[in-house]
Design a protein with these regions (language model features):
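A polyanion-binding, active-site-adjacent surface
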Residues: 15-162, 169-171, 177-178, 183-186, ...
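C-terminal substrate-binding/active-site "lid" region of AdoMet-derived donor-dependent transferases
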Residues: 199
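Generic N-terminal amphipathic, Lys/Arg-enriched alpha-helix
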Residues: 1-13
Length: 227
């Protein structure tokens, strides 16, 4: 089947698109939509993370769980929201840690992280879709087979990538990563429920750039400006 995904990723993942589990994902989504269910993000944005960050450009992977499930929030990038949408609490806590870590003031009314994606930060959710107002509703339809493969491909075929694993769910993916040639940084999830248990003070943004510079790669400019 012809999946609308950026060319470098299509080449890397081409074998996945014909596997039974992937065809089942497609069937599941079509069935839910035909039954009147609203699914986020919109179809054209399901692979937005891949379209914004080409495979050869990936230098950081920021792993989320599933897309935001409220109207207008999800646009295919983990933790990110479109222009005009107020940053959710987890993203506000990410901003607080950036300011504490590297002294950059972040825009309280702006949560679009596309600028990070364009620099090589793959903003990957483990599940690429969700039913409206039902968090975790697509956890068992097969997406994790796909995104686990994505993580493994990055680990196997690239070197010197930073994997940011926040919270237990993300940290369970550590087994997919070859830590002899990549950097894994772990912390609590930035959710208000857990940020004080080890996310605040983790300094992952400066640590990421320190590692990238040592690898001879450009550091990430984390600063965001309200358009």
């Amino acid at each position: 089947m012809d999946v609308q995904i950026e060319a470098s990723w299509k080449a890397v993942l081409k074998n996945e698109f014909t596997k039974p589990y992937f065809l089942e994902i497609v069937t599941h989504l079509k069935t839910e939509k035909a039954g009147g269910k609203t699914i986020y993000p919109p179809g054209s944005l399901i692979f937005n993370a891949f379209n914004q960050t080409h495979f050869d450009k990936v230098s950081v992977v920021l792993l989320g769980q599933d897309p935001y499930h409220n109207p207008g929030q999800a646009h295919g990038l983990s933790f990110s929201v479109p222009n005009g949408v107020k940053p959710p609490p987890s993203l506000m806590n990410i901003y607080k840690e950036i300011q504490s870590d590297i002294g950059i003031a972040m825009p309280a009314a702006y949560g679009n992280l596309t600028k990070w994606a364009e620099q090589g930060v793959l903003l990957l959710n483990a599940m690429l879709t969700v039913r409206a107002n039902e968090p975790g509703s697509h956890q068992k339809i097969g997406w994790m087979n796909f995104t686990d493969t994505v993580i493994k491909k990055i680990s196997d075929e690239k070197e010197g990538v930073v994997f940011l694993l926040w919270g237990r769910f993300a940290q369970d993916k550590q087994v997919l990563i070859d830590e002899t040639k990549h950097q894994v940084l772990k912390a609590a999830h930035p959710s208000p429920l857990s940020a004080h248990n080890g996310f605040f003070g983790c300094r992952h943004f400066s640590k990421t750039n320190d590692y990238l510079v040592k690898q001879g790669k450009p550091p990430i400019d984390w600063k965001l400006l309200t358009p």
